[in-house]
Structure formats: C-alpha cells, structure tokens
Amino acid sequence: MVRSWTFERRWVDGTVLKRPEPAAVGIVGGGQLARMLAAAAAELKLPLVVQTPHADDPAVALASDHILAPLEDVEATRELARRCRAISFENEWLDLERLAPLEAQGVRFLPDLQSLKPLLSKRGQRQLLDELHLNTVRWIPLEAVLPPPPAANPDPWDAGADPAAAMLAPSTTGSGLAPQVVVPDPPGPRLPEGFQFPVIAKASEGGYDGKGIRLLNDQADLERLLEEVDPQGWLLEEKVPFERELALTACRDDHGNVACFPLVETHQHQQVCDWVLFPAPTGHGVELYARNVAVSLLTALNYVGVLSIEFFWGPGGLQVNELAPRTHNSGHYTIEACGSSQFAQQVRIVAGLPMGSPEPRWNGALMVNLLAFRGDEPAHERARQALAALDDAHLHWYGKKGLQLGRKLGHLTLPLQSSDREQREAERERQLRRIREIWPLPPLNRP
C-alpha cells in the first residue's frame, strides 16, 4: 500500500502548489525511450506525464497524461513541473540556458542541469574524460588543424619607424622600380603531430546513430570538411582499432547509491545498433574496470539518474567512446533479463523511491533491434506477427509512424540458456539467424 500525503512547493512568485504524493514523474520527450519509461511507471503504479509535440508520438499511448508542445517550449515544461515531483529527459538535445530559470525557481530536473552540462556535447565529454584521467580516444578540436593567422605586415607609420626614410631609400634593383615582393601561399590545414589519416570527424552536438560522423581518409577529405562545416562545432578523433564495442548502464540515486547493470557487447549495422549481447564475452577484470569508470563519472558529476557508457575494447584496453545521460538502446535487454530494468530505475530515482536490483535473472540475453527494411507496411506487419509468435521471444513495438529505411521500429529480446561463453556465442548466432530469416537487415547502401 502506497502512503499519500500533501506535498507543497512555493514558487518564487508566491504561488503555492499542493498535490498528493506519490507525485507524477515528468519526461520531456515522447519517443520509444519515453514509452518504455511510461510502461515501467505503470508497473510501479506511478503516474508519468510526457511533454511531446504530437499526439501520435510513441509514449503518448502509455503515459498517464501528456502535454502536446515542442520539447524546447519552456512554458510547457513549466506546466509539466506543476504536475510532477521532478522532471527527466528522454534525450540530451537540451537548451540549458532556457531551462536554467526554471531550475532557479525550484523545478527539479534529474539529472540536474549542472551534471548534464559537460555531457551534452562530444567535446564536453572528451574534456570531462581527460580531466578525470579516464582512458579514452585521443582527440583534438577541429579548429586545431587550421594554420595560425598570418603575421601582420609591418606598418611604416608604426612608432619607431621613419616613413620618410623608407620612401627616400634608394632602390636596390638598379632599375628605379620597387622590388617585387613574393607572397607565399598561406599554409593549409594540417593534422598535428601524432595524428595521421584516417581520422574520424564528429559533430560535437546532435549526432546519433551514425549521423554527424565522417571518416576522413586523406588531406582532401579534411579540406572538404572544412569547406562545409564550422570547425568550432566539430572534433577529430583517432581511428581506434578495436575487437569489440561494449556498453554499460549505471544508476545513481539521490543518496549517492550506485547500481550497475552487467557489461554488454553491442554490434552496429551502418553505425546503428543491430544487436546487444548480455553478458559481454570479456573477463571479469574488464567489467570491473568499466564499473569503476561509471562510479568515477557519476560521483564526479554528482549525477542523479541513469547514465550509459559506450566503450571500445581492443589493443588500447578499455577506452570510453561516448556517454549518454539517459536510458540507452544497449540496456533494453534489462526489461526482461534483470530484476529492475534501466527504465524502472530511472522512474524510481525521479520518483524518490529506492532503486531496484539490477542483478540478472537470466544466464544471458540477445536483444535485436528491428530496423525498417526494404518493404511496404504489410511486409513489416507480417514480419512483426511472425516474431510475436516465437517461443520465449519478448517483442517491443514502438508504434512509430513511417517506415524510413533503417528506422528503429521495435526490438526483440530472447533468453540465452548457456552459461558457457563459447556455447552462448553459438546460441547467439543461431538465434540471430532465426530472427534475420523473418526480419532482414536494411541494405547497406541506405541513405
């Protein structure tokens, strides 16, 4: 039985808001992540309200209530705050300057805006990782490749110069003509010492699922990029050789308690997550190091909420690739495979409830993203029904409109029975082949 009492918040304008507890959880965003947060809230018997632009956005169908407004509409977020105990975000595309006045007036964002600030851009993430001395990919801001500005030409009227003497000085050419001055071509952009092609160029903000990423193979690619983008908004990273891509989702509550889900392997198709394997086929020491990285980040930021970390594993050891201040595609398997899912953890934290157990309930799991393939709506529907009929398969359909090639339409999670690493890998391959016979991958040449 959940106790109920009156909660009061006094705004700076004197307005007093009274409401019963437990209060609603507020989410800015209405996509598939918000939809799964709403499903988790419903299981916990907690109301959840979303702010999202369209009535047919995925989360609206499962949320307790909704506010139809653009995500950047601050007045709509103010209204969301009036209905909710605290607010969290579905994604990191935030305008902190617009939200800061609300936080100053008492609106509670989790994570708070100060914790989010270094995580909203790839450049900010890289700087944070460097400050914490965490192993990450070597990088430089794109403007570092630009040549220094040319030195100013000497001005004959500068102090200490004798303009008359300069004008009366005899010619050294013997012809009476002023000598020709050869102006060298300005130097072009250059990679700094220690970097060599190929390198990865990334937009600092807004990139996801392969968007905002370019492979630069040579000097011509670099010069072409500089003609097309503002260098201040991009960075360059060394192209890292790696054996596997890994990910870990971690949570921290208001009291500083930290819980980590198991380390997983992720696989990409055209830079979009294709499948996730739990547990990752690595040693215990690798997972322990990943958990230490998570604790370091959460503690340094005084972060409250769910944080997801992507890693490279290879010759350079375990290197942090990117951070996501939210629930993450790599953690969808936790809905069935763990005691408390990443979505339930986020809802619990925002609602002020104790975290649940992240411990696994299965020996292993395979999560497969269902990306829109080449085909019409009936073809996708037939494939969806076939997947739903599979034994032991847990289908999550997001209810999105439109079949843009490669779009994430849902995901499927299947248990893996073996506790032996090699046998589990063989089981993963069998299950994946079975899924791909029903739901093919989109072609490699998608736009």
What are these regions (language model features)?
Residues 1-127, 131, 145-178, 185, ...:
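ATP-binding N-terminal substructure of ATP-dependent carboxylate-amine bond-forming enzymes
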Residues 3-5, 10-11, 21, 46, ...:
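Peripheral (often C-terminal) accessory segments that flank ATP-dependent C-N-forming ligase machineries
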Residues 30-31, 51-54, 90-92, 112-113, ...:
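Fold-independent oxyanion-binding glycine-rich loops
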Residues 59-60, 204-206, 403-407:
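Short, flexible turn/loop "capping" segments at secondary-structure junctions
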Residues 118-247, 251-297:
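Active-site nucleotide/adenylate-binding loops and adjacent lid/helix of ATP-dependent enzymes
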Residues 228-282, 288-320, 324-332, 344-357, ...:
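Phosphate-binding core of ATP-grasp and ATP-grasp-like enzymes
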Residues 335:
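A conserved FAD-binding loop/helix module that cradles the flavin
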